[in-house]
Structures are given as C-alpha cells and as structure tokens.
C-alpha cells in the first residue's frame, strides 16, 4: 500500500495458452503511483469476430496474431527481424532472487524466438527497491539481426541524448 513503491513484474509462459498473447518476456512497471510500462490488454472478442477475425486459431500463421494487441510488437518485450514470437515456444523462471536489496528474475526466452536468434535471455531486477534494470543478453544467428526493444507507456517521451529518453507523466 506504499504509493511511493516501485513495482515490476515479468511475464513468462507461452503464446499458445488459452486467451494468450505474444507477450513472453514482457514487463509491467509502476513507480511512485505512476504506471510507466503497461499492457494494453486485449481487444473485445465480439468486435473482432463480427469482422471475420479467426480468433480461436492459435497456430503460428493465424489471423489472431495480426491483431496488434495480441502480438509481440504491442508488448514490453523483444522482436527480431519484425517476426512474431513462436507460438510453440515456452519460457519459464530460470533464476531469481528475493533478497531485499536485489530482487530479480531471469528467463531464457530463446524458445519463443526459435530460428530468429541463437539465444535470448532477459533479467528484470528491482535494485534497492528504488529502480528497475531490464537486461537482455542476445546472441544472433545471422550477421545482421534487427532487434526491436519495445516499451508501451502512457507517458510522453523526449529524446535527450543518444540512446537516452526521458519519460514524463503526472508531473
């Protein structure tokens, strides 16, 4: 109930579960009562079904994944060469710490990026209960691999330096 606390959570699992999204590796982040990294949620099923979208097909080439809110491009996770996560892949908790000054979780995301990268691992840490570190360790399979790091936020973003953005929301 501390309004000044920092909260972070990371999603593992598989896109192929019932009502699943391609959000494996995604994180949520709230600090000082402000939501910084968010999940947009799903689309209203009836609205999509009346437009002919085949929602309940969860195969890799399904129309379901063309719905923006259901694919990895709309979540706080990674994308490689603008491809979808592999629906047959599954990630789990591979390591964690619940020590008060360095809480973290680690997951090998490689199974959801099959044939896209050799290895993709993500660690999300809450350090000293004050700040969050998202660390990705990627080993590419090709000489050129385009990686996209996405964070969905309701905040306004301003580029302040090379590779540095300032997020502002609620003062």
What kind of feature is each model-predicted range?
Residues 1-171:
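Extended polysaccharide-engagement surfaces of secreted carbohydrate-active enzymes
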């Amino acid at each position: 109930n501390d309004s000044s606390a920092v909260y972070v959570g990371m999603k593992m699992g598989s896109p192929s579960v019932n009502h699943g999204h391609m959000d494996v590796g995604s994180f949520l982040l709230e600090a000082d009562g402000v939501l910084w990294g968010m999940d947009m949620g799903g689309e209203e099923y009836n609205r999509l079904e009346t437009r002919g979208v085949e929602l309940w097909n969860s195969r890799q080439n399904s129309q379901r994944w063309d719905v923006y809110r259901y694919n990895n491009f709309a979540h706080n996770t990674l994308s490689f060469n603008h491809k979808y996560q592999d629906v047959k892949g599954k990630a789990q908790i591979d390591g964690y710490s619940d020590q008060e000054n360095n809480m973290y979780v680690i997951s090998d995301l490689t199974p959801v990026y099959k044939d896209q990268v050799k290895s993709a691992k993500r660690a999300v840490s809450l350090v000293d209960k004050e700040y969050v570190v998202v660390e990705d360790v990627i080993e590419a399979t090709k000489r050129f691999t385009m990686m996209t790091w996405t964070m969905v936020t309701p905040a306004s973003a301003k580029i302040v330096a090379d590779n540095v953005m300032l997020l502002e929301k609620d003062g």
